[in-house]
A protein has these predicted regions:
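Predominantly extracellular beta-rich ligand-binding scaffolds that present long acidic/polar faces
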Residues: 1-114
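Surface beta-loop-beta hairpin patches that serve as ligand-binding interfaces in beta-rich domains
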Residues: 111-114, 118-158
Length: 158
């Protein structure tokens, strides 16, 4: 990231859906998302953020949607130092996601296991059903069309 953002959309990004991800930001990230163009034209439009888990462990991260059009935020969970949902969000969640070991580091894909929800996590049965549900989660576990927030359907690695 060039300006300290976790997600950057610069230019004419159109019709994208950012769905069922787990984002963990440390003190190095200033904004969760930055959307802008230098001249205000050809901006990002028709973007949906749905069922994502945003954990901010550091700065008071925000969304900076400078000149985007038709951004939709649905059923995202916010936890950490920044717990304020995006403006106009439908069904936001602000609760501890109860992850296995958030903030831990590791090597490669094994580090992802620290960000898996525990069995009591509120992310496991929340969220908006996606229009086209993924067949599997990050680890290859079947989603069986269930709704969930974040990248993992449950704590079991396949």
């Amino acid at each position: 990231n060039v300006k300290g953002e976790l997600i950057a959309m610069v230019g004419p990004v159109r019709g994208a859906t950012i769905e069922n991800n787990t984002f963990y930001s440390t003190g190095n990230v200033e904004r969760l998302a930055e959307v802008w163009t230098a001249d205000g034209t050809d901006q990002a439009a028709d973007i949906t953020f749905r069922n994502n888990l945003f954990i901010s462990d550091g700065k008071n991260n925000t969304f900076n949607i400078c000149n985007g059009e038709n951004f939709v935020f649905e059923s995202n969970l916010y936890w950490g130092t920044y717990r304020t949902p995006a403006q106009g969000e439908d069904m936001p969640v602000t609760a501890d996601p109860l992850l296995v070991l958030p903030g831990a580091s590791g090597c490669g894909r094994e580090a992802a296991e620290y960000y898996v929800p525990t069995p009591d996590s509120p992310v496991l049965h929340e969220g908006t059903p996606p229009a086209r549900p993924a067949e599997t989660d990050f680890f290859g576990n079947s989603t069986a069309g269930r709704r969930y927030i974040g990248a993992f359907i449950d704590g079991a690695r396949k």
